[in-house]
Amino acid sequence: MPKVALYNINGEQVGEVELKDEVFGIEPHEHVMHEAVNMQLANQRQGTHDTKTRAEVRGGGRKPWRQKGTGRARAGSSRSPIWRKGGIVFGPHPRDYAISLPKKVRRLALKSALSSKVLDQNIIVLDSLTMDAPKTKDMVRILGNLKADKALVVTATRDLNVEKSARNIEGVKPLKADGVNVYDLLKYTKLVITKDAVAKIEEVLA
């Protein structure tokens, strides 16, 4: 079982915590993490883009000029794709970009991302993280004590004081344990996570 230091909000080590091998100690699968990130980004796409074909553009019902005798090229509609203001050929139309991955693959990707944080020594476990009131300055000080500037801050449950204190800091994102995902774990250098949040993640993934 990997052991990591346990810190308080002043950046002082107050002990050690053992992490479960099956969640934080596996060999990271880069390809699986890549697939999970692709899925997450694809599923965020709205897919509402649309262009009008020659059948949908307004006008163009009348033949611009007669077929023969004018010396000009043949034309059947002023909304032909080769004309100005004509319809669009092969343009985008509304579609669903959603990608699905098997549950086992999604879990493996999440375990891989968590394990990579341990391997790279980019995980900081806190004994607790509570704030009396939302104050960005206090959160900046806490993260400064922990030497974690670009960080994903994870708590066991939603804490509005922590969330409001962290959300306006550039390069910092607050999350609750059940919202942890591969994309954010890879995007942010440090994972600042409470001991309770670790237990909650292990309970779900172990």
Curated annotation (Swiss-Prot):
A molecular function GO annotation: structural constituent of ribosome
Keyword terms, alphabetized: Ribonucleoprotein, Ribosomal protein, RNA-binding, rRNA-binding
Disulfide bonds: none
Keyword Mitochondrion included in the entry's annotation: no
GO biological process: translation
Listed InterPro entries: Ribosomal_uL4 (IPR002136), Ribosomal_uL4-like (IPR013005), Ribosomal_uL4_dom_sf (IPR023574)
Entry keyword annotation includes rRNA-binding: yes
Sequence similarity: Belongs to the universal ribosomal protein uL4 family.
Protein name per the record: Large ribosomal subunit protein uL4
Originating organism: Desulforamulus reducens (strain ATCC BAA-1160 / DSM 100696 / MI-1) (Desulfotomaculum reducens)
